[in-house]
Amino acid sequence: MAKKSHQENNDNLIAQNKKARHDYFVTDTVEAGLVLTGTEIKSVRAHRVNLKDGFAQVRNGEAWLMNVHISEYDNGTYFNQDPLRNRKLLLHKKEINKLVGALQDKGVTLIPLKMYIKHGYAKVLLGLAKGKHQYDKREAIKRREQNREIERVMKHY
């Protein structure tokens, strides 16, 4: 039996950054683990995550996920962490070096696309992205509407 990839199985999908592909050209993706505390992983499993304004950076040879909101766990006490704290990403050194090289280009950033649970561990799918201009967004919307119109016409035949 073929092994399912993380993109085929959406049962464990926690959060998805839907605006990312609208606002950016995503050229490459990489999967990274997250260092979370106990109450944070409970909030993640409860789907209380917002990736919208998040981004990742490489500092001192370590990758960090920033500005991702993981809500406080309802039943947590003083163990709850700051919802917007920086979280360390677990990547191999080769992957970090590859990202550092790619991030040297002007206008390239690292954004979270999806967060999911894989084999009991929280993972985040990061995308190497370059920002779109307004005319690129309009062109994509126009192309999408044309495809819908073609599908609608073809459906009747």
Curated annotation (Swiss-Prot):
One Gene Ontology term of the molecular function aspect: RNA binding
Gene Ontology biological process terms, A to Z: trans-translation
Keyword Chloroplast: no
Transmembrane segments: none
CC terms in the record's Gene Ontology section: cytosol
Subcellular localization, as worded in the UniProt entry: Cytoplasm
Keyword RNA-binding: yes
InterPro entries for this protein: SmpB (IPR023620), SsrA-bd_prot (IPR000037), SsrA-bd_prot_CS (IPR020081)
Signal peptide positions on this chain: none
UniProt feature coiled coil, ranges: none
SUPFAM superfamilies given in the database record: Small protein B (SmpB)
Pfam families in alphabetical order: SmpB
HAMAP family per the UniProt record, alphabetical: SmpB
Described purpose of this protein according to its UniProt entry: Required for rescue of stalled ribosomes mediated by trans-translation. Binds to transfer-messenger RNA (tmRNA), required for stable association of tmRNA with ribosomes. tmRNA and SmpB together mimic tRNA shape, replacing the anticodon stem-loop with SmpB. tmRNA is encoded by the ssrA gene; the 2 termini fold to resemble tRNA(Ala) and it encodes a 'tag peptide', a short internal open reading frame. During trans-translation Ala-aminoacylated tmRNA acts like a tRNA, entering the A-site of stalled ribosomes, displacing the stalled mRNA.
Family: Belongs to the SmpB family.
Protein known as: SsrA-binding protein
Species: Limosilactobacillus reuteri (strain DSM 20016)
Name of the gene this protein is made from: smpB
